[in-house]
Amino acid sequence: MCRLLGYSSRDAAPVAELLGPENFRAFTSLSALHADGWGMAWYAGSRPAAWKSPDRAGSERVYDKLGWQPLGDHGLVHLRWATPGLPVSDVNTHPFSYGDYTFAHNGAIYPQERLAAMLPPEWERQLAGSTDSERYFLHIMWRLAERDGDMIAAIADTVAAISADYTTTSLNAILLAPDAMYAISFYDRSMVPVEKLREFGHGDDADEVAAYFDLAYQATDDAVLVASSGWPMPGWTPLPSAHVLVTDRRTLATTVLPIRTANS
């Protein structure tokens, strides 16, 4: 399980400035639980750049340093809480990149012993690590090629295929393309890891548990932000499950579209 934060803004700006210092600290504090690595990706042009580490975000000066730099106008932040059985390592740390696209995921896909069947062999060979998340991303890239660049169709095909063939807790994700940000909301509230949360002192607040997989977004004239729950987000707009928020990088126009699957 992980925490997600994505942004598109008029001009290159520090993500800490877009959120505000207090909110950036609040989001970063979630790394006390989501302590198995962190990553940032950003676009200053048409190609993504990234920095990631398998250590805890709140313990690394470089995380705060990057958070206060105007890296780009389009980017994401990921805090990882590793799924048991998937190693904490550089190659398993989000975000993942393929060509001009970059991606981060919150959730788990089971059973792990069947993950290799998620991709055709030629796409499985593209893996850098061993996670369900990277395979989820490459599945979208595979479908994108089959769909002649139709990202919404590729996302819908992927979510439908994975949710039909595997058990998923959440397929929440942020996918950045050179021209748009896609925030994918697709989760099962019954799959919130309550016992794991309780191990870390977080599972007794019913509202917190119920909202664990929630995504919400904030759109202003200067920026669009989308993020996971767990910190104060007054005035943000909930992004319902089985929907994708599309943000046009150039205009900052937002569109919320349903993800069509057999069960949604």
Language model segments and positions:
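Long, charge-dense
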Residues: 116-144
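A conserved acidic, glycine/proline-rich C-terminal tail/linker
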Residues: 200-243
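Conserved beta-strand-loop-short alpha-helix elements that form
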Residues: 2, 101-111
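Short, compositionally biased leader-like segments
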Residues: 6-9, 43-45, 50-78, 136, ...
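Catalytic core of PPM/PP2C metal-dependent serine/threonine phosphatase domains
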Residues: 148-188
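Short acidic (Asp/Glu) patches
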Residues: 24, 54-66, 78-99, 118-123
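Gly/Ser/Thr-rich active-site loops/lids in small-molecule metabolic enzymes
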Residues: 127-129, 186-215
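Extreme N-terminus nucleophile/cap motif
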Residues: 1-58, 202, 224, 242-246, ...
